[in-house]
């Protein structure tokens, strides 16, 4: 796969992050796990600069993908996992498809136990409702587009770090809380 990071490489997951929130969109639990790549053993400078995750971080705090995925599944439990893919529909798996790709990549059994939904489709509807002009966005850009990035300053992270990105999604959901009330029913 051609990817701008370092020629032809597999899309190995290096970080999985997720939040659990209550009905008022307050964080009740946080999941953040680094994964040690098995194929692309050295993270490219592009990736390190993009995410702020270093090779030392992965070596010291990372676990193999299979362990990280099992921990992630345990964290999610029976809840719906909302991820973000700008060009996808609400029913699309988005990040779930990347996790499934990594299961295949590592020869692990397919797993459909986690239910994924694409929250970007809801953001598009809300942006249209409030005339927020956005032609595309990544999950980490949500709080910046809304001028709310100061709310995430204490994370000391930036866009494309998965933990920052999930907090950025939550920042947007909180900003438009009434419009995202549908998430409480899922």
PLM-predicted stretches and their roles:
Residues 8-10, 82, 111-115, 134, ...:
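Short, surface-exposed helix-loop/turn micro-motifs enriched in polar/charged residues
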Residues 109-124:
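Conserved beta-strand -> loop -> alpha-helix junction used to position metal-binding or nucleic-acid-contacting
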Residues 35-42, 46-51, 55-58, 120-166:
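Active-site-proximal helix-loop-helix substrate-binding element of RNase H-like nuclease domains
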Residues 1-100, 144-146:
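Conserved non-catalytic scaffold segment of RNase H-like nuclease domains
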Residues 1-3, 121, 168:
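Short, glycine/acidic-enriched loop or turn micro-motifs at the edges of active sites
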Residues 24-26, 105-112:
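Short helix-capping segments at alpha-helix termini
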Residues 77-98, 102-103, 132-186:
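Acidic, Mg2+-coordinating catalytic module of metal-dependent nucleases/exonucleases
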């Amino acid at each position: 796969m051609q990817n701008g990071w370092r020629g032809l490489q597999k899309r190995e997951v290096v970080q999985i992050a997720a939040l659990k929130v209550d009905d008022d969109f307050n964080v009740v639990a946080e999941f953040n796990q680094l994964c040690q790549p098995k194929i692309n053993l050295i993270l490219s400078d592009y990736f390190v600069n993009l995410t702020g995750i270093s090779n030392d971080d992965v070596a010291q705090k990372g676990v193999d993908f299979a362990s990280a995925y099992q921990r992630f599944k345990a964290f999610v439990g029976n809840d719906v996992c909302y991820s973000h893919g700008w060009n996808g529909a609400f029913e699309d798996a988005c990040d779930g498809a990347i996790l499934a790709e990594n299961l295949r990549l590592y020869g692990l059994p397919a797993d459909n136990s986690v239910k994924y939904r694409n929250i970007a489709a809801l953001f598009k509807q809300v942006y249209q409702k409030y005339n927020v002009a956005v032609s595309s966005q990544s999950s980490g850009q949500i709080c910046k587009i809304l001028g709310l990035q100061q709310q995430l300053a204490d994370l000391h992270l930036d866009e494309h770090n998965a933990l920052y990105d999930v907090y950025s999604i939550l920042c947007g959901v909180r900003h438009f809380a009434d419009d995202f009330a549908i998430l409480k029913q899922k």
